[in-house]
Amino acid sequence: IGAVISAAGVLYARDKLDNILHVELDESSLAADNDISDYRNIVILGVDTRDMSNFSGSRTDSIIIVSINKTSGDIKLISVYRDSFLDIEGVGLDKVTHAFAYGGPERTINTLNRNLDLNITEFAALNFKTVAKVVDSVGGIDIDIKDDEISQMNTYLPETARYLKSDFEYITEA
């Protein structure tokens, strides 16, 4: 059920939020495995940029493949470790996070398809601000922290609030 909720959130965000990059991809450059017809695979890319209009030099901090079984409707989320060494076309072995810096979403999808035998032709790229909007749109997320984590959490609150243009309150108890 968690996968269904996650996928629904991603699709809602993809349609409703303005901080998600929409790009037409050159499908001939994606190296999609056309023999895979029973699954629709979409990649969600969490990028390390604050400016969604300029991805130059950005990397992916998070790579999640949403795999939808077309027959059963089952949805699986697969996280690809950002530091996995994969063969990046024209570069050689490198961390998959760097594929985005070398060629944006097309190079990243090409790398995933060629190395993992997938058929990805769709993606959503989100930055931190977009993730915050998605979380807000579902009413927030409760997290449990320990007393010894409060100080560290409070260190990041002012900068995060400034970036999101929002108010914050320091955490006083776990």
Question: Which ranges hold each PLM region?
Answer:
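Entry/capping segment at the start of metal-dependent catalytic domains
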Residues: 1-73
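Extracytoplasmic
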Residues: 37-40, 58-63, 72-80, 91, ...
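Flexible, solvent-exposed short loops/turns enriched in glycine
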Residues: 76-103, 147, 158-162
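Short secondary-structure boundary/capping elements
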Residues: 10, 103-104
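Solvent-exposed coil/turn segments that connect beta secondary-structure elements
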Residues: 47-50, 68-73, 80-85, 101, ...
